[in-house]
């Protein structure tokens, strides 16, 4: 498929090799090497929304437009193919992570405002991410980042009535748990699988799910997922430059619940460990 899509773009000639890369649970990701040594990344997808890659390209442009975050150059975009500049895998140096903290903190600070949402809906995986504008961060996160996944068929199959009620109780208490914070431009899916490196080692973001919401949403993805040892410097450096309200580390699991519910909504019973983690986070909110 990838060769057919490249040929349709006039980029199918003199290809020396194709290599399928790891990751990419939604799209297939390929490293394309041409005879002259040039390399590009090609993402292909079938059966997804026709604007999936266009939304991704727009998100990369928005992040790059802050003037602080590095993104790969978008070379071409169609309904079934996204062609990107090829970059190196994520490195693991304290200097790179500290610079990334500066980049992300500056991007968050420079985009702060009071409206939550985005001009268009996006995607987290294959599922639509609703970005309807609101001035309430608690309402935005409750309605569009937590409750919206409960009605997905895969989630309905595995979440019990008690699970659903616990999510609803958590949403009702969000104003007690999450302090008022401004809306900033967030990457939206900022785990290490969506980070690569430029030749000089600068950390570069890929695969965004952008929206204007709390900065801590981005932090929660990095905090709650496995990460390289050198990344420990990231959190200290970020807090020096863009301090979160006190108790930020304790809020990370709550904010990361959005990711767990998304995984359940995509994979249902095929993600038992995620279901267990979700219930651990929700434990204080089950009826007693």
Segments from the language model and where they lie:
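Conserved PLP-binding active-site segment of the aspartate aminotransferase-like
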Residues: 83-85, 258-265
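Conserved N-terminal boundary motif of the eukaryotic protein kinase catalytic domain
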Residues: 12-19
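Active-site Asp-x-Gly
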Residues: 137-142, 151, 181-185, 192-253, ...
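An alpha-helical support segment within catalytic cores of ATP-dependent transferases
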Residues: 1-8, 112-186, 198
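ATP-binding pocket architecture of kinase catalytic cores
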Residues: 19-139
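Hydrophobic packing residues in well-ordered alpha-helices of helical domains and bundles
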Residues: 53, 97-100, 163-167, 274-278
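ATP/Mg2+ or Mg2+-diphosphate-binding catalytic cores
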Residues: 233, 263-288
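A general structural signal marking secondary-structure boundaries and capping sites
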Residues: 67, 108-115, 153, 178, ...
